[in-house]
């Protein structure tokens, strides 16, 4: 018994010692030795240089009484280049403490200039460094601003294939405390060439005060191409069809700013011409070298509507809306096609002869099964050349909160109550106002591959469920509602797939105008323009309590069953462990009892 007591005491001491070590490690957090040099974080604007040591954990709060927001810019960050962001970083919080919403995080691995804005008049930033002893410094610039005030010509969206922009007030000195963002977005298949014909900002080795940041993509986190300042004429080239340019200035030393122009280059090789079709437009690309071989100039090209002009770069591009620019729509045998003609302007009426071949480029988009077919042919002295490729309809389907179909539900998976009314809308994304959407079939399944079992909500345009209500035809939208259910002997996931038919409103014999018909009467196989849309999963709310909110949910009952052997193995292992513990305890008790008996009957030694 004495040995048992000692073992028990040692166990208690070991546990208490371990708890004390954990507590010491948790409480022994790095302290902050970095200094702001007496700076007042209540000033309207301030530039700060922070020199940091290893094992720092520093937090500062910027705050003023007036109701204005704060913009903080970390224009130069020198942290441990080998440290992970989890161990060494800068975190910025919206509010007076680190318990506020996290606005963002920056570390040595980031490829952008970190800029954050508060929602109100207070902002907190925290800098944590690891144990590595390297030189660290962070340049911080912040200022208060009113969110409702703007600087003229400060940023914007540029969507043409070529253009130009400049700093506000150019060529006069740029304004103070300016933060301007220009987004350049051109058509797919192009890349952007940006050229600064003049750049005159405050000079600094690290461009900490006034600078321009150029990003290779659609946002300020797309990947920094370069941060520039001073004087020069830098050039940049994007890797895609988007580029972002930022101008940031402080409160002193304003100069002329900059002037920049950009042009687009079509990346893919086009020997003669190409055509692609979307739900709202036709896109024709013509090679300039092809035109030159015919002794034509791009300025002589025109559509059925001569006012619709092409965009010219290293290629000539026509972006032709399906219901504008003289596009002709034709309905034949339940097939919709869109046609336009690119021609070359005729010789002057005073001319008597010509040695140029008469050339026409006829472009047609024809709607096909679950896709669109593009057909392009050229007539050249009565010689026809054909070309065809494939595209797809642009459709989507989503859940809405009510029958007004105003508030889209973004949550996925979407948790519902059993028998709750659900509102579904299928949408055709097109600029053609004369098209209408018809819901031919809508089917539910417990799995995303729609294997057996399935359950029909709508079939042949008819409601097959007592709670399902199909709404009347409504332009580009097909709508219905039904009450939530679950599949027996399966998990509570439900996926929906709808077959959508697209008709022209002027075609009174179309399938869309027939409504609900029996399977014997309908003639869908001859229909060329239909497509599928899928949404899901929809799950019961009680499964949220079981599975949590992670969204990583099992999709079939078989998947759940496949995990059961692992659970049985865990149970068996636990039982074996418990049995071993019982055996050890029993043996120990018997050992001490036997020793106690030996001591109890030990014969006294006779002297």
Curated annotation (Swiss-Prot):
Cytoplasmic topological segments: 590-607
Signal peptide: 1-19
Glycan-bearing residues: 22, 67, 195, 419
Membrane topology reported for the UniProt record: Single-pass type I membrane protein
Ranges for domain CUB: 32-146, 154-265
Domain of life: Eukaryota
Induction field: By estrogen, tamoxifen and growth hormone. Repressed by progesterone and by the antiestrogen ICI 182780.
GO cellular component, one term: zymogen granule
Disulfide bonds: 32-58, 85-107, 154-180, 207-229, 442-498
Biological process, per Gene Ontology: female pregnancy; hormone-mediated signaling pathway; trypsinogen activation
Stretches of the chain found on the membrane's Lumenal side: 20-568
TM ranges: 569-589
Primary localisation category: membrane
Tissue specificity: Expressed predominantly in epithelium of uterus and oviduct.
Keywords: Cytoplasmic vesicle, Disulfide bond, Glycoprotein, Membrane, Repeat, Signal, Transmembrane, Transmembrane helix
Protein's name according to its UniProt entry: CUB and zona pellucida-like domain-containing protein 1
